[in-house]
Every structure is written in C-alpha cells, then in structure tokens.
C-alpha cells in the first residue's frame, strides 16, 4: 500500500514539507509506503474549460506537474494534500493544480481517486476537502484540525501538538487502508454507483 503526499508549497523543504515528512515517518512505522510529490515553484495555469481531457483522458496541457501526478495517482492507495495558506486559502498554484487534476481525471473517466481515502494538511481544510468529497473519496481525520504552525521548518518542529496531529492522521490513514484491504479480501464490494444527476438550480 502506498500514500502520495502532495507538497503544494513553493518551498520544497519548508513548513508543509516538514508536516508531510512527519506523516511519512509514521506511515512507515505502520508498514505503509509513501512518496512526497512536490508540485514545484513554477507557475501552474488554471483550467480553461477546453474539455480536451474528455478526448485525451488527461489534461490537454502537458507542461507542468498535473499529468505526471495523475499518472502516479492511479497506482496510489491514498492521498494527503498539503498547502501553506495564502490569504485564508491554499496557494494559487495548489488550487490550479487540484482543479486540473480532479477535473481532467473525472472528465477523462480516469477514476484515479474514486473511493481512495484522502486528507488535507492546511488551514484551508474546507476548501481542499471539497475536491475529495466530489470525487467520492473518504476523508481521513485526525484528533484536531490537520495543520501545523510556524514560519520556518524549525518552528514547525516546536509545534508538538501539530506534529502529534500529523502522526494521528497518518495512523488513521494506515488503519483505513488496512480495513479497506481486509474488506476487499473478504469479498466486500465497493458501493454501487449511480449516474450523476446534475442540477442547475434554474429549472
């Protein structure tokens, strides 16, 4: 089993990385592999609604980390997305990245995320969790909000409560993945899916 940890910070080894590294260490203790995927610090454009992903099965733009991540996501069993908070929300790059990752996978019928557990590590939990619920991903919690505090990685290492929250999150993720694997081995089928009913709130 493997969990992809997404570092949405423009700083490769900053505070967000420090939180994800704490999670990775605890996952390893639980027998779960992990990989930290950094989205980089170059500009990532937002979705332009071209619907090229419907035909291609991936985003039409191939000059940034979006398609590379989605390809990795197909083989992953769970996800944790981390982002610093810029103006009460995730970074612009992280938002554009997740918009295109989830939209292109959904429209391209990729199902890289369907029924796979996910969690967000950021003060912008509600914003990031919306991606998971739309993609029908079980959302993994901890014992408090999934966040750490500090201006530097050294500050984060002093946030003992925040680091504990990261460890609890990792153990909860590991527990869910093991339960999911045990259920599959026992013959428990995924829930039946229905064709989406789209309401435009006009008619």
Give a label for each model feature.
Residues 7, 38, 143-144:
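Residue-level recognition of beta-strand->loop/alpha-helix junctions
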Residues 29, 133-134, 138-203:
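Glycine-rich phosphate/pyrophosphate-binding loop and the adjoining helix
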Residues 32-42:
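A short beta-strand-loop structural module common to alpha/beta enzyme folds
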Residues 51-55, 99, 158-160:
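Short, hinge-like loop/turn segments at secondary-structure boundaries
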